[in-house]
Design a protein with these regions (language model features):
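C-terminal beta-strand-loop-alpha-helix "lid" module of Rossmann-like NAD(P)-dependent dehydrogenases
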Residues: 1-294
Length: 294
């Protein structure tokens, strides 16, 4: 049975852990608010760009005519997967869900040659240990995430695609739904999907473009790819903070419950010790009394 000293030590240890989890929850909540604000601010821009892209593709000609190399559909087997995870843990199933989704996609892929671009230390370490081919990784920028980081990743992916080193590029990340819900998402990034590029989309306004739609596409399509990568990074960052906030809230609650249980154990053990000491005193007094009478 645990001694009073052991129970006190455990209570102090759990209280110390509770302080840490509570602080981590507060930090994650503050960062989550800022991340949510960035997502809300970015959505109108991304939506308008998608609308303009659809009109431009329609104006430049049928999609099958491939008005830009980033729209070219190739039948090759080389596939690249961009996997976005966090650098740190303590975020519930945030990283494991992405890793599981990526492994399932790779297993089900008919492409014999699959290479990875991994964002985040957790994903990099996991796939490196299992011998996957990692073309590139990016780590240590999450606390200062900027558009430049997304542009660096997107430009690397576009170079790979335009140089015909890969035939498809897919993106796997956690989409932020709410503080408690992050959904693993798989999207095709390159070639830009037909629906995303506006095929079949009704054009309600007939725009006149200067310069030509083809010339504008040459600038807009790379911007679109960079924007999609940046959006995925922001979604993942907000999801990480939400998952960590939820996990730390649960850990803080569990610590509180454990402290209550340990406190009850401590009080019972202390009461038993006091009762035993009283019985010893009473027993000793009785023995002395009987000795005196004899």
């Amino acid at each position: 049975m645990a001694t009073l000293r052991d129970i006190r030590r455990r209570i102090r240890s759990v209280e110390s852990t509770q302080k840490i989890t509570r602080a981590m929850k507060l930090v994650a909540a503050a960062k989550l608010r800022r991340a949510q604000e960035r997502i809300v601010a970015a959505r109108p821009y991304a939506g308008k760009m998608a609308e303009l892209l659809g009109n431009l593709v329609s104006s430049a000609g049928a999609h099958d005519e491939a008005p830009h190399p980033l729209l070219v559909q190739r039948a090759g087997p080389r596939r690249q997967v961009v996997i976005i995870t966090a650098d740190r843990g303590l975020a519930g199933a945030f990283n494991s869900n992405i890793v599981r989704r990526a492994r399932d996609f790779i297993r089900q892929s008919s492409a014999p040659d699959v290479t990875l671009v991994v964002v985040g230390r957790k994903g990099r370490d996991f796939f490196r240990r299992r011998g996957f081919t990692i073309k590139r990784d990016m780590l240590g920028f999450w606390d200062r995430l900027a558009y430049g980081h997304a542009a660096e990743i997107a430009d690397f992916l576009m170079r790979q695609y335009l140089d015909a080193e890969v035939d498809e590029v897919h993106l796997i990340y956690n989409e932020f739904r709410s503080v408690a819900v992050q959904r693993p998402v798989l999207e095709q990034l390159l070639p830009i999907p037909r629906a995303e590029a506006g095929e079949g989309r009704a054009t309600t306004v007939d725009y006149l473009y200067e310069p030509s739609p083809e010339a504008i596409l040459g600038d807009l399509l790379p911007r679109h790819v960079r924007t999609q990568v940046f959006r995925a990074l922001m979604e993942s960052l907000a999801g990480e903070y939400g998952a960590r906030m939820t996990a730390m809230e649960a850990a803080t609650k569990n610590a509180k419950e454990m402290i209550e249980v340990l406190t009850i154990q401590y009080n019972k053990a202390r009461q038993e010790k006091i009762t035993k000491e009283l019985l010893d005193i009473v027993g000793g007094a009785e023995a002395l009394k009987q000795g005196a009478e004899a």
